[in-house]
């Protein structure tokens, strides 16, 4: 009886599976070579992140994490690398709020190490010093985004009520 109860509890939980992880797009530009190689190396990194999701089928989603790294050296662009790291995920039995969290926080957390490796590899192939991107707390970014949405919704509600 206990085993049957545990099985039923497990079936009520959300199920998550990675089907595939792949690079959807990769771009690398070095607009100021070879002059940038002659400069003292004092890099300044600008990092941009974006996540998009698409439902492919019932319970099947594509999540694309776009990471753009622009490195400036002495006010000129040394290089720009952009990777669209994608994954196809099966998610079953998740409540709407849980699904949103999985798609916009958990899945990007899975994809980021792959994107980081692709960026590092391209930078090294371009003969620049290794670019090591720090880990990103996608849970914190997700919570910040939720708070911003709630504030925006609250501000709209206040405007309407006055």
Curated annotation (Swiss-Prot):
Q: What does this protein do?
A: One of the proteins required for the normal export of preproteins out of the cell cytoplasm. It is a molecular chaperone that binds to a subset of precursor proteins, maintaining them in a translocation-competent state. It also specifically binds to its receptor SecA.
Family stated for the protein in its record: Belongs to the SecB family.
Q: Where in the cell is it found?
A: Cytoplasm
Coarse class of the protein's main subcellular location = cytoplasm
- Subunit description: Homotetramer, a dimer of dimers. One homotetramer interacts with 1 SecA dimer.
Q: Which HAMAP family match?
A: SecB
Q: Which GO terms describe its biological process?
A: protein folding; protein tetramerization; protein transport
Report the GO molecular function annotations.
Answer: unfolded protein binding
An example Gene Ontology CC term for this record? cytoplasm
Q: Give the UniProt keywords, A-Z.
A: Chaperone, Cytoplasm, Protein transport, Translocation, Transport
Q: What is the name of the protein in this document?
A: Protein-export protein SecB
One Pfam family hit: SecB
């Amino acid at each position: 009886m206990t085993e049957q109860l545990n099985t039923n509890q497990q079936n009520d939980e959300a199920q998550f599976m990675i089907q595939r992880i792949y690079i959807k797009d990769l771009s690398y530009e070095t607009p100021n070579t070879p002059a940038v190689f002659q400069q003292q190396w004092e890099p300044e990194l600008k990092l941009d992140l974006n996540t998009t999701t698409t439902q492919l089928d019932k319970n099947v989603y594509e999540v694309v994490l776009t990471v753009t790294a622009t490195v400036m050296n002495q006010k000129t662009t040394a290089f720009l690398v952009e990777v669209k790291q994608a994954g196809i995920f099966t998610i079953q039995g998740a409540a709407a709020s849980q699904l949103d969290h999985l798609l916009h926080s958990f899945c990007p957390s899975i994809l980021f190490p792959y994107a980081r490796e692709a960026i590092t590899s391209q930078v090294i192939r371009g003969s620049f010093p290794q670019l090591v991107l720090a880990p990103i707390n996608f849970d914190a970014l997700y919570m910040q985004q939720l708070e911003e949405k709630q504030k925006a919704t609250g501000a709209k509600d206040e405007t309407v009520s006055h």
